[in-house]
A protein has these predicted regions:
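ABC ATPase NBD coupling module
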Residues: 65-83, 113-114, 229-230
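Short coil-to-helix segment of the ABC ATPase nucleotide-binding domain corresponding to the Q-loop/switch region
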Residues: 95-103
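A short, proline-enriched helix->beta-strand linker immediately N-terminal to the Walker B motif
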Residues: 155-159
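Catalytic Walker B motif of ABC-type/P-loop ATPase nucleotide-binding domains
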Residues: 161-164
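Helix-to-loop junction immediately C-terminal to a conserved catalytic motif
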Residues: 48
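Conserved ABC ATPase signature
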Residues: 136-140, 144
């Protein structure tokens, strides 16, 4: 069980998150939608302390961390239960694909390098990049780089995978391969919290869709509830703006 309680975050005088509460069940795929600047990515980044919330509590299984009073060890334990997929891939340019995936196993999990590289190759095979292990990021397409980024997060076998707009930096021709991999993970019952503008993905894959506006969760429900029977005027306006009527 994953639980966010009363999460607040301010940047200067601007309150970006206004007391978010969210429970996530094991194996659940939750997609967060909403206009830019509504706090979606900030919420995602507070889950594993890439951004430290000003107030609130985050619980993943047996680890519960107060965002105001905590130790480095508690934060590290929380992070070890999550994997983060960045919008801009965030691969190490001086490492090949295999090394990028293996790095976390060595530095976070304490694996021997040879074992980590072997596991990394297995993951590359699994994500359809088995022949790209020796390739450096500059030699990979955007879609391939993002799949390596997902593979790196998968390698740690996290309780929760966090996706921050994983397709928004991609050329259109590479979006499909990344979404296909995410669907594969969903079918394997990987718990996922996804911020995306890919409405079709939300419709097809999410167990629950959350609409955020002005730092709050305004409406949430099944894809059918959100897309076919929206209640809040702000959600109706947003769906109209993105071409869903």
């Amino acid at each position: 069980m994953i639980k966010l309680e009363n999460i607040h975050k301010r940047f200067g005088e601007t309150e970006v998150l206004k007391g978010i509460d969210l429970d996530i069940k094991q194996g659940e795929i939750i997609v967060i939608i909403g206009s830019s600047g509504t706090g979606k990515s900030t919420l995602l980044r507070t889950v594993n302390f890439l951004e430290q919330a000003d107030e609130g509590r985050i619980t993943i299984d047996d680890i519960s961390v107060d965002t105001q009073k905590h130790t480095k060890a508690e934060v590290l334990a929380l992070r070890r239960r999550t994997g983060f997929v960045f919008q801009n891939y965030a691969l190490f340019a001086h490492m090949n694909a295999r090394q990028n995936i293996a790095e976390g196993l060595v530095t976070v999990r304490g694996w021997k390098k040879a074992d980590a590289l072997k596991r990394a190759q297995q993951i590359l095979d699994d994500i359809g990049l088995g022949d790209k292990g020796d390739s450096y990021p500059a030699a990979l397409s955007g879609g391939q780089q993002q799949r390596v980024g997902i593979g790196r997060a998968m390698a740690l076998q996290p309780e929760l995978l966090l996706f921050d707009e994983p397709t928004s930096a991609l050329d259109p021709e590479w979006v499909g391969e990344v979404l296909s991999l995410m669907k594969k993970l969903a079918n394997q019952h990987q718990t996922m919290l996804v911020v995306t503008h890919e409405m079709q993905f939300a419709k097809e894959v999410a167990n629950r869709v959350i609409f955020m506006a002005e730092g709050n969760i305004v409406e949430q429900g099944s894809p059918q509830d959100i897309f076919d029977n929206p209640q809040d005027p702000r959600l109706k306006k947003f769906l109209n703006q993105v071409g869903i009527e």
